[in-house]
């Protein structure tokens, strides 16, 4: 595993493209399209992709994933965080690999611009279902969080979420992924 990074690659046609349809306070904001860097971070990208499509099943055999989950943490000029469909508050963790967490895949890509998709974690090798999207360059996260995708359409939606009113970094109105899947 390398801590040195390279610039984010251009969109690669073989990489999966997923989407989130997002609502704020019950009102639709629009669609985010995300490229997953399966060519650089295949395990991390696949974990996220299956939570977008609902292919992953819980212990009861029901689909589990991002549909209906919230962006529970929003910090202006930093990032928007979501993906905790377990508890909804940033404490839950789940993977497609049958464990609550999985290891950091690599730190090849850097947090060098807005619109990057990266794993939220609670320390080394604690990746699960939570993710964040950067709203600025965040180089202090390099070597700590795995970059595994980028926003390819809908950065205006990210900015709307970033600018929503919050109390202690929690949006005052629910920011919900009302639909998601693979393009």
Swiss-Prot record:
It holds the Pfam family Pro_isomerase. Keywords: Isomerase, Nucleus, Rotamase. Gene3D superfamilies: Cyclophilin-like. GO terms for cellular component: cytoplasm; intracellular membrane-bounded organelle; nucleus. It catalyses: [protein]-peptidylproline (omega=180) = [protein]-peptidylproline (omega=0). PPIases accelerate the folding of proteins. It catalyzes the cis-trans isomerization of proline imidic peptide bonds in oligopeptides. This is Peptidyl-prolyl cis-trans isomerase H. It comes from Emericella nidulans (strain FGSC A4 / ATCC 38163 / CBS 112.46 / NRRL 194 / M139) (Aspergillus nidulans). The gene is cyp3.
């Amino acid at each position: 595993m390398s801590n040195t990074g390279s610039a984010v690659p251009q969109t690669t046609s073989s990489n999966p493209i997923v989407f989130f349809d997002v609502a704020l306070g019950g009102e639709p904001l629009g669609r985010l399209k995300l490229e997953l860097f399966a060519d650089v971070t295949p395990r991390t990208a696949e974990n996220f992709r299956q939570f977008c499509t609902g292919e992953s099943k819980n212990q009861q055999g029901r689909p589990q994933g991002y549909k209906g989950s919230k962006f529970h943490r929003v910090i202006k000029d930093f990032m928007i965080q979501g993906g905790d469909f377990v508890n909804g508050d940033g404490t839950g963790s789940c993977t497609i690999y049958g464990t609550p967490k999985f290891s950091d895949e690599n730190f090849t890509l850097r947090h060098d611009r807005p619109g990057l998709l990266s794993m939220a974690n609670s320390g080394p090798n604690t990746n699960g279902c939570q993710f964040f999207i950067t709203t600025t360059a965040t180089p202090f996260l390099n070597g700590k969080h795995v970059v595994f995708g980028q926003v390819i359409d809908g950065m205006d939606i990210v900015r709307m979420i970033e600018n929503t009113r919050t109390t202690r970094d929690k949006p005052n109105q629910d920011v919900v992924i009302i639909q998601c899947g693979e393009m």
